[in-house]
Regions:
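Conserved N-terminal beta-strand and adjoining loop/helix that marks the start
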Residues: 1-21
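Aromatic-acidic/polar surface patches that form glycan- and anion
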Residues: 4, 32-36, 102
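Short, hydrophobic/aromatic-rich beta-strand segments within well-structured domains
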Residues: 12, 21-24, 88-92
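Conserved Nudix-box catalytic region and its N-terminal flanking loop in Nudix hydrolases
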Residues: 16-54
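Nudix hydrolase/Nudix homology domain
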Residues: 26, 91, 96-124
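Short, solvent-exposed coil/turn elements at secondary-structure transition points
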Residues: 31-34, 64-69, 107-109
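Active-site segment of metal-dependent pyrophosphate-handling enzymes
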Residues: 52-96
Length: 124
């Protein structure tokens, strides 16, 4: 299963295979589509935003899907019309050298998300 997987508290994990995930650092491997933007326009915008990164060439992956608007914070949903129910999400990858710190095992990533949830609940 490739593509983007939403986890709570704003943690996005790109599932690479059954075992490893990519944790986004400063290089965003995904983008929320903007109004009137198709996957090609989104890819061009991402390439412009990441120009000068020096870490490889941005490669567009297939359109990932639409996610429920309620999963996103208000500063994102406010950019869209009030009546919309879902927001398009596109995934990308960088060709070139990968940074090992960006790759962790899927089970470790799940533990990180669970810990974040417990910490947040503890402080509420």
């Amino acid at each position: 299963m490739n593509g983007i997987q939403y986890e709570s508290f704003g943690v996005y994990l790109v599932l690479l295979d059954e075992e490893y995930v990519f944790l986004p650092s400063s290089r965003l491997p995904f983008s929320l589509g903007k109004k009137g933007e198709n996957p090609q326009k989104c890819a061009l915008r991402m390439k412009r935003e990441l120009t000068g990164d020096g870490e490889g060439r941005l490669v567009s992956l297939p359109y990932v899907g639409r996610m429920d608007k309620d999963l996103f914070p208000s500063f994102i949903t406010s950019l869209w019309a009030p009546g919309i129910k879902t927001i398009p999400v596109y995934a990308f990858k960088m060709e070139g050298e990968r940074k090992e710190r960006d790759w962790i095992r899927l089970d470790e990533a799940r533990k990180m998300v669970e810990k974040a949830e417990k910490d947040v609940l503890f402080f509420i």
